[in-house]
């Protein structure tokens, strides 16, 4: 099964939410709810408020996303 077309946006984590969810403000000023990708959980990469991240979203639901990368 081919991977769906995904949209990637850089953003900043503004708030930590329960259940390993994060509120992320994207560069285009939209705010979304995102969770960490499985590889980030597996490698124990911590995400804190104020971190710059790369968020992956589907074109079907633009209010939720997945954090795939934390910039240094």
Swiss-Prot record:
Pfam families: eIF-1a. GO terms for cellular component: cytosol. Residues 1-72 form the S1-like domain. Keywords: Cytoplasm, Initiation factor, Protein biosynthesis, RNA-binding, rRNA-binding. It is found in: Cytoplasm. The keyword Lipid metabolism does not apply. PROSITE patterns: S1_IF1_TYPE. Transmembrane segments: none annotated. One of the essential components for the initiation of protein synthesis. Stabilizes the binding of IF-2 and IF-3 on the 30S subunit to which N-formylmethionyl-tRNA(fMet) subsequently binds. Helps modulate mRNA selection, yielding the 30S pre-initiation complex (PIC). Upon addition of the 50S ribosomal subunit IF-1, IF-2 and IF-3 are released leaving the mature 70S translation initiation complex. Belongs to the IF-1 family. HAMAP family: IF_1. Component of the 30S ribosomal translation pre-initiation complex which assembles on the 30S ribosome in the order IF-2 and IF-3, IF-1 and N-formylmethionyl-tRNA(fMet); mRNA recruitment can occur at any time during PIC assembly. NCBIfam families: infA. This is Translation initiation factor IF-1. The lineage of its organism: Bacteria, Pseudomonadati, Pseudomonadota, Alphaproteobacteria, Hyphomicrobiales. The gene is infA.
